[in-house]
């Protein structure tokens, strides 16, 4: 049993933000970090590292947990995060007390709701943001990112320097083992993807798929695969048929044992995208998905819910590079379903419209769900 969610923690939801992290955990989606644009102000506001927003897929409510102790990460954007054994690990990002990128690692215990700084042994990745991260066999993997020139021990990876910002793109690949508390560079075969940032990755059937991202002045549309069992890179996968346009700041979500869902991003021509594609990992084909809405998003986050829905939160809805206009940031949740909402959930939605005093005529399990939706009782983060 993990930390109790109190009725007092019910929230209207996170403010609009960009560059945050979001991960699935049991029946929940955890949202942390990111920043917001301030109209008419040259600087951005980074959200407090003490705040963790929790979205319940069952009650369809937001909860806010503010960390009361003095130990919590600084507000950052472009971090990456995974959940391993009831702990949220957050790595890297930008905005650390105005010092640019960081390679710090933090842990949030999901049973005690306490943050702690992790100090692993071994040589860490160079400080970056906008990298991709994933969990496999209870280890944390990090690939790529946009960061500071390497000033530490020699690394064997590509670094493409961007002189205007004194930073650059990298294809560094590192593994963090929580049991050993060590960083290491896994031995791999095959051809690594080129240096990139603002790409996306998804794990499926023992393989991780990496799509797109920015490399120098190019926003790419290549797909790469790493077999996590034998640590072999595929090189760029040959694709049959149409391919999504090149992009960065998009999301890629494993939907089943076969398909990945790509959503949104930022095009080569600085257009905020709202298209959705499904990638078949068996046949290596892309198929566009027609959605009943058009909601442009970039630098958003996407998670798979317990109901096999892709939940997309946050991100910019307008050109993030337009200096004459403050970018607009989304506060709603975009839901992508590959099949209709279940009859049970639809009935619950309809039943809520009826007076509460007739709920007593319903079975107890349905009453419990309705009470969760209305917030009448305290709640636990229950295992799925």
Question: Language-model segments: which ranges?
Answer:
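Glycine-centered tight turns/hairpins at beta-strand boundaries that repeat
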Residues: 11, 25-45, 67, 84-100, ...
